[in-house]
Swiss-Prot record:
InterPro entries according to UniProt: Nucleoporin_prot_Ndc1/Nup
Family to which this protein belongs: Belongs to the NDC1 family.
Keyword Nucleus annotated: yes
Name used for this protein in its record: Nucleoporin NDC1
Biased composition (Polar residues): 407-421
Bilayer topology annotation: Multi-pass membrane protein
Assembly and binders: Interacts with the NUP35/NUP53.
Pfam family, one: Ndc1_Nup
GO cellular component terms attached to this protein's record: nuclear membrane; nuclear pore transmembrane ring
């Protein structure tokens, strides 16, 4: 899925990714494995619960903990935890994936990489359920058991029967593993939210631990309920298949079949399956939480490297290169932190190069921040145009904000994309620490699609399934280039229906070129098909876009823009007293112009019909949903950044060159009327 990157660039990206994240990943995996014996001990204690003989209960539990078979299964569980941790590393994302329609959500779930993720987790869930069943002992330990009523099968010899209790355990573990994988992508659990307040790793883990255990127990309860319903209707299929394949009998004299109501009302079985699910989810969530804590910990990027060989990791070069997304997020987070709390590092930003006397550090940092903010402005303008005209944003071409060039841009001049793409499928496009990604040629667009059929492409092109901007297009509005998921012929037809002035107007007569009769007939048929399908409730149920999801998708990567705002505004405010060379004053008009233009775009955006003016109340949950309110945090950060600059410089800003509209808006900030 990753775009083709040259070998040296990919190698440098992998090197910096390993230097920054390598030890964090190893530490999170080690702690996940070290915490596994504690979880296993709790599981053994509760699996042998005996309230009437507490001393005997505890002594037997701890004696079993040191037995050879428990140690063996503990090693096997450690391998499972390592595999789960590797998948956490491979599938993380710093930009959440927000499908804007139900069909896009289905496409996200059935993507080949997601299917592989689900299959592996189902297998690992079955392995953990097998280990839990054996550790529990009793009637759940083995899949094959001797038949008690051997004579009933017509032979006095000993017969082997299928232990349906053990099969129930294995299938429940597989379903729990698959459900974990499904919710992992549906709830954006692969999204890495960066903490607003920096805390010690132990404090963050301790704060999440109680919520983690509670969430695991409740989720296991619901999964057991769902599995019982599923086993009641379909349980006979795996039971008959395994018994036939292994030539096993089904002894109904020992216990009732579990695919009946009376068989499923076995409270002991339900309790142990629920406990197994809670154990599985707790250990997997612990590894997931530890990876999130370690990966989002702040990292210090030096502004000026002490040695020449360390220049690849200095902050200006990281920001202006094309690093992996998480490295760029960590760099912007570091910019936000030191701009507030480190005067010595701020002095390095304001310093001049020797020899030459050029402000390379400030130029590189401010240029990247302004490029990010200009990119957000253009994105909001495109969204407003699409919403105002009921049209469609051109998703086929990435938005390239205008680059800021200056004479000082010689040191850190590297080709790059100034705006990170916002994928619609989970952002798996990152440099892997372990292996290269399995790529599929179908997913090339920034918004991506898991479908390759031309028929589905044309169908999706009619309803614009995966595009998060705009709404279904009216017949009179055909604009802004080809739709998503269109074939080459469709693109040519769209280009023909959108003639540019240079091609549609002749140089002599300035007359419009009329479309052919065949093309008009095709267009009419397409509109008739579109109107026919739009009246079908089931089709519109899958193709209609959710307004809230479309709005969230616009601000899905707003976290790095928030850090760019805060870092840039704090540096500008600090320059009033700390900038001895006046390097900030040369770019202050451009900074104010960018911030005020962005403020105007944000104000217009929040006046749109579907844009709520108040953030929704988000209840405390293990799964982070802060990305749903990023637009409100971005609006507050933008206004705070402008006020931070105006309160620091005061009336001195009246001497800054700006347009009349910006001067008026700046005066409102100076008078605290915004």
């Amino acid at each position: 899925m990753a775009t083709a990157v040259s070998g040296p660039c990919a190698g440098r990206s992998r090197d910096i990714l390993w230097r920054v994240l390598g030890w964090r990943i190893v530490a999170s995996i080690i702690w996940s494995v070290l915490l596994l014996p504690i979880c296993t001990t709790v599981f053994i204690i509760f699996s042998r619960i005996d309230l009437f003989h507490p001393i005997q209960w505890l002594s037997d539990s701890f004696s079993d903990l040191y037995s050879s078979y428990v140690i063996f299964y503990l090693l096997l569980l450690s391998v499972v935890i390592i595999i789960i941790s590797i998948f956490n590393v491979e599938f993380y994302a710093v930009v959440p994936s927000i499908p804007c329609s139900r069909l896009a959500l289905i496409g996200k779930i059935i993507h080949p990489q997601q299917l592989m993720h689900s299959f592996i987790h189902a297998a690992m869930g079955m392995v953990m359920a097998w280990c839990a069943a054996v550790i529990t002992q009793g009637q759940y330990s083995f899949l094959v058991v001797p038949c008690t009523g051997a004579n009933s099968f017509g032979s006095p010899a000993a017969q082997t029967c299928l232990n349906e209790y053990h099969l129930f355990f294995l299938l429940a573990g597989a379903l729990m593993g698959y459900s974990y994988s499904l919710l992992y992508f549906v709830n954006n659990m692969n999204y890495l939210p960066f903490p607003i307040i920096q805390q010690y790793k132990f404090l963050r883990f301790r704060r999440s631990l109680l919520l983690l255990v509670k969430h695991s127990c409740v989720e296991s309860l619901f999964l057991v309920r769902n599995f019982c319903i599923l086993y009641y209707f379909l349980g006979y299929i795996p039971k008959a298949w395994i018994s036939t394949a292994m030539n096993l009998h089904i002894d109904e004299q020992v216990h009732r079949p579990l695919d009946t109501v009376s068989g499923l009302l076995n409270l002991s079985l339900l309790y142990h399956v629920w406990l197994c699910g809670a154990f599985l989810l707790t250990t997997w969530y612990v590894s997931w939480i530890l990876f999130k804590i370690y990966a989002t910990e702040a990292h210090v990027f030096p502004v000026q490297p002490p040695f020449a060989e360390g220049s690849d990791e200095c902050l200006p070069k990281v920001l202006n290169s094309n690093p992996p997304p998480i490295i760029k997020y960590l760099a912007l987070q570091d910019l936000m932190l030191f701009s507030q709390y480190s005067p010595s590092r701020r002095q390095e930003v304001f310093s001049l190069s020797q020899p030459g006397g050029h402000p390379h550090n400030w130029t590189a940092i401010s240029r990247e921040c302004l490029n990010l903010l200009n990119g957000m402005t253009q994105k909001l303008v495109l969204y407003q145009e699409a919403a105002a005209t009921n049209g469609r944003v051109s998703s086929s071409y990435p938005v390239e904000p205008k680059k800021l060039n200056s004479p000082e841009e010689t040191t850190f001049q590297t080709p790059k994309s100034s705006q990170m793409p916002r994928p619609s499928v989970p952002p798996l496009v990152k440099t892997s620490l372990f292996s290269s990604k399995l790529s599929t040629p179908e997913v090339v667009s920034p918004f991506g699609t898991p479908f390759g059929s031309s028929v589905m492409n044309r169908m999706a092109g009619i309803f614009d399934v995966n595009t998060c901007f705009g709404s279904p297009q009216s017949p009179q509005l055909i604009r802004r280039g080809p739709r998503l998921w269109t074939s080459a012929s469709d693109q040519q037809m769209t280009e023909f229906s959108n003639p540019s002035p240079s091609t549609s107007i002749s140089a002599e007569g300035k007359t419009m070129r009329q479309p052919s009769v065949i093309y008009s007939w095709i267009q009419n048929k397409r509109e008739q098909i579109k109107n026919f399908l739009s009246k079908r409730v089931l089709i519109m149920y899958f193709f209609s876009k959710h307004p809230e999801a479309s709005i969230q998708a616009v601000f899905s990567d707003a976290q790095m823009h928030i850090w760019a705002l805060e870092g840039l505004s704090h540096l500008v405010a600090a320059s009033f007293t700390e900038d001895r060379f006046g390097v900030v004053q040369t770019t202050l008009p451009a900074i104010l112009n960018t911030l005020l233009t962005l403020q105007e775009a944000v104000d217009k955006y929040f006046k749109l019909p579907h844009a709520s003016s108040k953030p929704p109340r988000i209840s405390g949950s293990l799964v982070d949903t802060s990305y749903k309110t990023l637009r409100f945090a971005f609006r507050a950060s933008l206004k705070t950044a402008i006020y931070r600059i105006t309160t620091t410089f005061g009336e001195h800003l009246n001497a800054v060159q700006a347009s009349a509209e910006h001067q008026k808006r700046l005066q409102q900030f100076l008078e605290f009327k915004e």
